[in-house]
Each structure stands twice: as C-alpha cells, then as structure tokens.
C-alpha cells in the first residue's frame, strides 16, 4: 500500500527532524516533530519514545529520559538507556527502586554495588533504612566485601551485622572483616569474644585478630587484656588503628612517653 509506505517514510523523516532539532537546541521543534511522527504513523510510538530518551541523554536531561522510558516496557536497549539515565541523575533512591526491573534484563551487580555504597553512606546512623536497603540488595551485592563493610560501618547498633560478619569470616577469612568485628555493641559482646578467641587457634599470627580482641576486651572493661592484644597486634605489623588504640590506653594509664610514641606512629602510618 503506497499510502502506508508514504506514512512510514514521512514518520521516519519526522523522527530525523526531531533529532536535528534537538541537536540545534530547538526543544519546541523536537517535541512537535516527535508528536507528528506518531500521529502520522502510530506504529512509531515506541521508537519515538526511545528516541526521546536518547535525545534527553544527549542533552544531559536524565529526568526527561526516565520519564520517557517509564512509559514503555523495557527491552535490553531501553534498559541500557535507563541505566545511563540513572547514572547521570545521581539519585540513588531512584536507582534502587529501578534495580528489580533492570536485574531481569542484564547483570546489574557492578551498578548495584555503586548505588548500595552511596545509599549506605547517605543513611549512616539510620538503622531502619540501612537494614531495609541492605535487605533489598541482590545476593551479589550483599556478599560484596565493600558493601557489607560499609553496612557495618554505617550501623549505629552493630548487633544487626554480627551474624553476617561472623558468617562471612567463617566462609573466607578476611582481616578487614575481622577488624570490623571488633566494633561491637554490648548485646553481642560475649558472643563476639567467644568467636574471636576461638579464631586464635588458626589465626594467631593475624594482627587484625589481635586488634579485634583488643577492642572487645576494652569494651568488656578488661584494660590489661586489651593492652596485651593491641601490643601483639602492633608487634605483628598491625595497622595504625592498633597504635592509636594502644597509645590511648597507655595515656589513660599515665604512661605518656610510650603513649606519645604509638600515637606518633599512628599518625605517620596514616
């Protein structure tokens, strides 16, 4: 049918005109051409919406791109456009809300990790939001070393993360996780002490474990045991945190010269 072919051709020409108008900064013209293209050939409705999103991204207007894409069912290409728009929008809440739909179409783990870290930092101290956010993540993100570590750091009530950290350490020994395990709450303090003391059998030479134990003993009001653990941690080449903790303990005990040495080391290692 020649009239149908003419409509096809005219519709495509109008889409091309919309692209040209966008490139020239003629926003009113762009919208007019997009509307006329669909009026001329209704089968171009989806193509016009996708083009509208592409053009919005080109002019760095992620909100317009997301509005357009939210009106259609996503396929792989449209989902990639939505991902670009979300990255450009810098709105972690909108990104989190979009993740379940995007996961169905391609691997979102890298993006999910990025967004999770932003959200977990933004909600630091707001445990209800942190727990909900962490629970909503896919398994890959929840098992990410960076994501789990940030979740633990952001929590004000550390008991929420104790089983997760202990399970992660049991699965694969990780000195950073072990150090975090020492950042305790009173409710899980005994359980943490028992677990950490049990790890000594296999990991007696890990400075992070002695740092962890030092923190736990300090919270348990066992300053002598804390001092021994922090001392062992720094002897094994532990991090600046061990020197800082030991320095503060020594100062509290009136041993200011030794304290100053460790605090100076903590600063020099930073």
Question: What are the residue ranges of the model-derived segments?
Answer:
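Start-of-helix register in tetratricopeptide repeats
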Residues: 8-12, 46-47, 77-80, 112-114, ...
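TPR-repeat structural position
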Residues: 27-28, 62, 92-93, 126-127, ...
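Single-residue signature of alpha-solenoid repeat helices
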Residues: 30, 65, 95, 129-130, ...
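Alpha-solenoid helical repeat scaffolds
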Residues: 35, 67-70, 100, 131-135, ...
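"A position-specific structural signal for the A-helix of alpha-solenoid helical repeats
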Residues: 12, 16, 51, 81-84, ...
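Alpha-helical adaptor scaffolds
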Residues: 19-22, 35, 49-54, 116-120, ...
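TPR/TPR-like (Sel1-like) alpha-helical repeat modules
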Residues: 70-77, 87-108, 162-175, 230, ...
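Structural motif corresponding to the intra-repeat A-B loop/turn of tetratricopeptide repeats
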Residues: 24-25, 59-60, 89, 124, ...
């Amino acid at each position: 049918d020649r009239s149908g072919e003419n409509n096809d051709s005219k519709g495509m020409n109008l889409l091309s005109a919309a692209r040209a108008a966008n490139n020239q900064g003629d926003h009113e013209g762009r919208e007019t051409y997009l509307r006329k293209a669909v009026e001329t050939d209704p089968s171009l409705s989806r193509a016009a919406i996708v083009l509208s999103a592409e053009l919005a991204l080109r002019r760095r207007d992620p909100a317009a791109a997301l509005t357009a894409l939210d009106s259609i069912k996503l396929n792989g290409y449209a989902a990639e456009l939505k991902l670009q728009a979300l990255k450009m929008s810098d709105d972690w809440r909108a990104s989190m809300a979009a993740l379940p739909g995007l996961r169905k179409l391609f691997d979102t783990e890298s993006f999910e990790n990025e967004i999770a870290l932003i959200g977990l930092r933004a909600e630091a101290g707001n445990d209800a939001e942190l727990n909900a956010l962490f629970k909503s993540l896919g398994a890959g993100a929840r098992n990410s070393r960076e994501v789990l570590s940030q979740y633990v750091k952001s929590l004000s009530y550390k008991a929420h993360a104790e089983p997760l950290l202990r399970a992660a350490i049991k699965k694969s020994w990780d000195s950073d996780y072990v150090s975090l395990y020492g950042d305790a709450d009173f409710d899980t303090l005994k359980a943490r002490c028992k677990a950490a003391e049990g790890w000594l059998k296999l990991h007696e030479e890990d400075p992070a474990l002695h740092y962890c134990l030092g923190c736990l003993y300090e919270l348990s009001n066992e300053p002598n045991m804390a001092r021994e653990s922090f001392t062992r941690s720094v002897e094994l080449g532990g991090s600046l945190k061990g020197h800082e903790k030991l320095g503060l303990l020594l100062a509290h005990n009136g041993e200011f010269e030794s304290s100053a040495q460790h605090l100076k080391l903590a600063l020099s290692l930073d």
